[in-house]
Curated annotation (Swiss-Prot):
It is found in: Mitochondrion inner membrane. It is a single-pass membrane protein. GO terms for biological process: aerobic respiration; proton motive force-driven mitochondrial ATP synthesis. It comes from Mus musculus. This is NADH dehydrogenase [ubiquinone] 1 subunit C1, mitochondrial. Residues 1-27 form a transit peptide. Its main location: mitochondrion.
């Protein structure tokens, strides 16, 4: 490469970045309403209901298992 070409490309690297004019750019981000502004109450209800059901089932199964353990080992 010729020295002038190397100097030109090197000077471009050292030159300060030029910001494009405001009229020629457009935002990459759009202003939208946040997702949490309007919760999907059906999904929230199903999630909470499923969680409550699973906890009740877990506790009930645990209590049955404890009773079975006590019965088999003669602790009750």
């Amino acid at each position: 490469m010729a020295p002038s070409v190397v100097l030109r490309s090197f000077s471009r690297l050292l030159a300060p970045a030029r910001l494009p004019s405001c009229s020629s750019t457009r935002s990459k981000f759009y202003v939208r309403e946040p997702v949490n502004a309007k919760p999907n109450w059906l999904a929230v209800g199903l999630s909470v209901g499923a969680s409550v059901f699973m906890w009740i089932y877990l506790i009930q199964t645990h209590n049955e298992d404890v009773l079975e353990y006590k019965r088999r080992n003669g602790l009750e």
